């Protein structure tokens, strides 16, 4: 099995990194690294424990997983089916407006649109050019499904579309003259409302509340149980809107749902299932790689107090960028996420105030010659961080001729300083305001650190201007992504974290600041998430313009990180207690279990 760990060629984006981790820069090794356990002394009596459960994933088991349905025959079949779908898109002019839109929507939800990005963009561009900046106003209930779907798809792809297209429908809603029993149209309208920006008052105040109420009434109406598929779609939409969902998990759900549709396309369904299995195989190779890396570091085995969550750390990256050709990027970001998890646990749980000051200074100075100033358990952590980040920087320098290590260093230093602020708040019993808490918490949630490493790994040509804006925390889309991640985390984890000893989270800060109940505070935080999505939608539209510094793919990945947070924390602390929060089941579904092929 060793060949799976070392010899398997990673799936990579750039040819020059094909030997990633096979030839590495010289590593620094501490003399005491062969056995690095936390110091056994009376000081340990003052240390806290997170009481985290062990990993749900055995390393040997991970090395053994494979998709039995992926073979040369299926790869050839996918190629043939892909050509058929491509032909459908090329001959789309013979289809109606609604048929074109539904085909694009199906391709996206089935997870295969990445094969046809140019064709899809051409179709949507034609829609936009034909209609002008404002689509015709929808004045008939029977046109609502097509108009709402077009609105959502165009906005999702960065085209400017005004909410005014719904003015006639809004007038009917407000005058109680809207008449339609087509729940499909209402669900489509509901989903479209989540592409709103902060200036879209009609979507916020009229359309979303109306559509939500209509869907709830449909779900609650026992006489509607005859249409099981529509009922499932309605419940699914109310649970989390499509725009906020983790794309890959949605794909797995929709493949099953699509086959139940009366008008489903047989070869499109087959194409989606085969493609899912092939992509899953790429993800399985990634998991084997990062699991071997984690085992080699000894962080999980030697630092008993940290969360052993390498699979969950990798799972985050599938939510960020799932396409098979980006395996190198997923592996890099998974390693970054694993290091973040370890360091977070040191600051949150184990480190003393004095030790945390030392570690923060060490990361800020990035001086390996001062390693002996750290306690033994911190040496292993810092040395691993030092080696991995320098190796990543070396890869970028070789491939892209730019030294990004100073930017990486600053990002990690800022993260550790944010962790230290929270540790001091907890130690001193300080209760920050919501504003003060969030100014620090959007950094301490680690999204800026993850995204700067993503940017350097992904970008073919790295811009110093963008790097500077990222490390200076000037990119609003990063702040928005981090804010959603922080608030989703707070809603799911704050009770457990407070019980074991941690700084107040946004819910408790708002309760303390305003005197409201916990239920009211949680509602307020949920509203903060919704408002932040509006900001992020605006940033995504801005990024679609040619003058934008950030690529659309970077912005989409930042949004995907926010989506992933709502998946990970939907049912509780998916990172700390993955089995209780249904994350183990979701990992099993996406990374282990293939889709059976007839």
From Swiss-Prot:
Residues 1-30 form a transit peptide. One of its GO terms (molecular function) is pinene synthase activity. Pathway: Secondary metabolite biosynthesis; terpenoid biosynthesis. Expressed exclusively in mature flowers, but not in inmmature buds. The keyword tRNA processing does not apply. (2E)-geranyl diphosphate binds at residues 307, 344, 348, 486, 489. Belongs to the terpene synthase family. Tpsb subfamily. This is Beta-myrcene/(E)-beta-ocimene synthase 2, chloroplastic. It comes from Arabidopsis thaliana (Mouse-ear cress). The lineage of its organism: Eukaryota, Viridiplantae, Streptophyta, Embryophyta, Tracheophyta. The gene is TPS24.
């Amino acid at each position: 099995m060793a060949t799976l760990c070392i010899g398997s060629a990673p799936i990579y984006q750039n040819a020059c990194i094909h030997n990633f981790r096979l030839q590495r820069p010289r590593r620094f090794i501490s003399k005491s690294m062969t056995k690095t356990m936390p110091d056994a002394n009376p000081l340990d009596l003052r240390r806290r424990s997170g009481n985290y459960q062990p990993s749900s994933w055995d390393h040997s088991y991970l090395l053994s997983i494979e998709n039995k349905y992926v073979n040369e025959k299926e790869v050839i079949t996918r190629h043939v089916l892909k050509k058929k779908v491509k032909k459908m898109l090329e001959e789309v002019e013979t289809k109606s407006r609604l048929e074109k839109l539904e085909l694009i929507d199906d391709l996206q939800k089935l997870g295969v649109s990445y094969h046809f990005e140019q064709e899809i963009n051409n179709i949507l561009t034609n829609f936009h050019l034909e209609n002008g900046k404002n689509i015709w106003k929808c004045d008939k209930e029977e046109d609502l499904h097509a108009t709402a779907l077009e609105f959502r798809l165009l906005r999702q792809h960065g085209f400017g579309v005004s909410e005014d297209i719904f003015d006639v429908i809004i007038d009917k809603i407000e005058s109680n003259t809207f008449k339609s029993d087509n729940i499909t149209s209402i669900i489509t309208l509901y989903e479209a409302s989540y592409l709103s920006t902060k200036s879209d008052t009609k979507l916020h105040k009229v359309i979303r509340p109306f559509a939500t109420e209509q869907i709830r009434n449909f779900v609650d109406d026992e006489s509607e149980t005859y249409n099981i598929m529509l009922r499932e779609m309605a419940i699914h939409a109310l649970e989390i809107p499509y725009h906020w969902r983790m794309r890959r998990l949605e794909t797995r759900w929709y493949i099953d749902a699509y086959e139940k549709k009366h008008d489903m396309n047989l070869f499109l369904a087959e194409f989606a299932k085969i493609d899912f299995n092939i992509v899953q195989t790429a993800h399985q190779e990634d998991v084997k790689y990062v699991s071997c890396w984690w085992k080699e570091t000894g962080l999980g085995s030697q630092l008993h107090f940290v969360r052993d969550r390498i699979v969950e750390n990798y799972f985050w990256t599938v939510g960020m960028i799932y396409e098979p050709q980006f395996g190198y990027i997923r592996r890099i970001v998974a390693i970054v996420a694993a290091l973040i998890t370890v360091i977070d646990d040191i600051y949150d749980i184990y480190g003393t105030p004095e030790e945390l000051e030392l570690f923060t200074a060490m990361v800020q100075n990035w001086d390996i010659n001062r390693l002996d100033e750290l306690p033994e358990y911190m040496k292993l952590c810092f040395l691993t961080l030092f080696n991995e980040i320098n190796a990543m920087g070396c890869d970028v320098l070789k491939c892209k001729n730019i030294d990004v290590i100073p930017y990486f260093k600053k990002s990690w230093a800022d993260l550790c300083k944010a962790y230290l602020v929270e540790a001091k708040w907890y130690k001193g019993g300080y209760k920050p305001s919501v504003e003060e808490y969030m100014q620090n918490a959007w950094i301490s949630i680690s999204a800026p650190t993850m995204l700067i490493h993503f940017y350097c790994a992904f970008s073919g040509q790295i811009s110093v201007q963008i790097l500077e804006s990222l490390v200076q925390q000037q990119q609003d889309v990063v702040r928005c992504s981090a804010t959603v991640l922080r608030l989703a985390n707070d809603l799911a984890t704050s009770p457990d974290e407070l019980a074991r000893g941690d700084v107040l989270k946004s819910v408790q800060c708002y309760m303390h600041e305003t005197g409201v109940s916990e239920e009211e505070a949680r509602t307020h935080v949920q509203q903060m998430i919704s408002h932040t999505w509006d900001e992020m939608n605006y940033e995504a539209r801005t990024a679609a313009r040619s003058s934008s510094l950030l690529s659309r793919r970077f912005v989409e990945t930042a949004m995907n990180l926010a989506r992933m947070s709502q998946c990970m924390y939907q049912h509780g602390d998916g990172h700390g207690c993955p089995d209780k929060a249904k994350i183990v089941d979701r990992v099993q579904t996406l990374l282990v279990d293939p889709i059976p092929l007839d």
